[in-house]
Amino acid sequence: MNHALNIDARNGNAPRIDETTPRALPSLAGMTREELRLVAIDCGVEEKKAKMRAEQLWRWIYHYGVTSFDEMTNISKDLRAVIADKYALHRPKLIDRQVSVDGTRKYLIELAPGVECETVFIPDVARSGALCVSSQVGCTLNCTFCHTGTQALVRNLTAAEIVAQVMIARDDLDEWPTSNENRKITNIVFMGMGEPLYNLDHVATSIDIISDGEGIAISRRRTTVSTSGVVPKIEELGARTGTMLAISLHATNDTLRDELVPLNKKYPLVELMNAIRAYPGLGNSKRVTFEYVMLKGVNDSLAEAKALVKLLKGIPAKINLIPFNPWPKSPYECSDWDQIEAFADVVNKAGYASPIRTPRGRDIFAACGQLRSESQKVKASVLRKQRLADGASPQA
């Protein structure tokens, strides 16, 4: 039986490489179990033994985080040499790493020439922390309070590129091999650049890899996917991933939400709330997190707090109140702290947990709503010319 691993199909958005440039070997880091099985077959392993070899590769890549085939000591030297001739173990390039005064770390990662995303590690006061990952470069939603919304969508990230963000952070934090003791990254939040539900296939595959107990092993219950309200995909997200759900809400009526989150014009609040109520597994042990950015004089009145309580009636939920994090030329100001506390008091008295999120990483523009890269979308006509220059079909 013939088997072919189509690496180009996995990275269909990646730009073509000029023929004069040595072609980079495809990396095993970010591949699924099935893809690793096909790699084994491609390297001459008998089909009946390929699953076992894939398991070995998986453990070395995702449990131990190795970056050299020489470290894979339970795989024969001959097989390692064959694999190393065809594949690599590299991560995407880490361009910049900034550390905030509060310990927050921001990583600028180059996925391809001119294509960059940002990832943020947020340490907790206890021995835990969350890694905020991106699912797209840029965004299409144009939320008016979010810096990423000022950057046009460049492209979706592949599952491998999402997983790579976790691996790069673990490299930096010295978190290999995987251990249940003294972990720094205990939670994954899809709250970085982009709308995850507009890239659900790759997001779901990345969660399968990240949550696997024999690898990185960050469970689905410790993974939260945030959406601005892509209603048709919410139930599918729950069915496919089993993760926690967060909603980027920010307003309690359609008029204001249309302004803050323009996606609301397509999927208004009544449709959004119905989709949330249908989320698989919803209950007191699996509450929805509602994110509410506090904008001075815009959505922070006590009347809005009461309207929020009414809107969420009957939904197991907690509300994260997020002090607005400014960015250059942003049109909003953060609510006064006394007003935020008064707002939280109304929500708390109604029986909802409503923690006020402590701003983290503001000094390095790593806080909520501040992420943005300088990547720009390459026009389709330019990509076609690149493909023709490489001798490929313009439709490739």
Swiss-Prot record:
Molecular function per GO: 4 iron, 4 sulfur cluster binding; metal ion binding; rRNA (adenine(2503)-C2-)-methyltransferase activity; rRNA binding; tRNA (adenine(37)-C2)-methyltransferase activity; tRNA binding
EC number: 2.1.1.192
GO biological process terms, semicolon-separated: rRNA base methylation; tRNA methylation
InterPro entries to which the protein is assigned, alphabetical: Aldolase_TIM, Methyltransferase_A, RlmN_N, RNA_MTrfase_RlmN, rRNA_lsu_MTrfase_RlmN/Cfr, rSAM
Gene Ontology cellular-component annotations: cytoplasm
Entry keywords, A to Z: 4Fe-4S, Cytoplasm, Disulfide bond, Iron, Iron-sulfur, Metal-binding, Methyltransferase, rRNA processing, S-adenosyl-L-methionine, Transferase, tRNA processing
Cofactor(s) the protein needs: [4Fe-4S] cluster
PROSITE patterns listed in its UniProt record: RADICAL_SAM
Any Pfam family matching the protein: RlmN_N
Cysteines joined through disulfide linkages: 132-368
The UniProt record lists the keyword Cell cycle: no
Reaction(s) catalysed by this chain's protein: adenosine(2503) in 23S rRNA + 2 reduced [2Fe-2S]-[ferredoxin] + 2 S-adenosyl-L-methionine = 2-methyladenosine(2503) in 23S rRNA + 5'-deoxyadenosine + L-methionine + 2 oxidized [2Fe-2S]-[ferredoxin] + S-adenosyl-L-homocysteine; adenosine(37) in tRNA + 2 reduced [2Fe-2S]-[ferredoxin] + 2 S-adenosyl-L-methionine = 2-methyladenosine(37) in tRNA + 5'-deoxyadenosine + L-methionine + 2 oxidized [2Fe-2S]-[ferredoxin] + S-adenosyl-L-homocysteine
Binding site for [4Fe-4S] cluster: 139, 143, 146
Residues that, per the record, bind S-adenosyl-L-methionine: 194-195, 226, 248-250, 325
Record note on cofactor: Binds 1 [4Fe-4S] cluster. The cluster is coordinated with 3 cysteines and an exchangeable S-adenosyl-L-methionine.
Region feature Disordered, mapped onto this chain: 1-21
Family: Belongs to the radical SAM superfamily. RlmN family.
Other information: Reaction proceeds by a ping-pong mechanism involving intermediate methylation of a conserved cysteine residue.
Protein name: Dual-specificity RNA methyltransferase RlmN
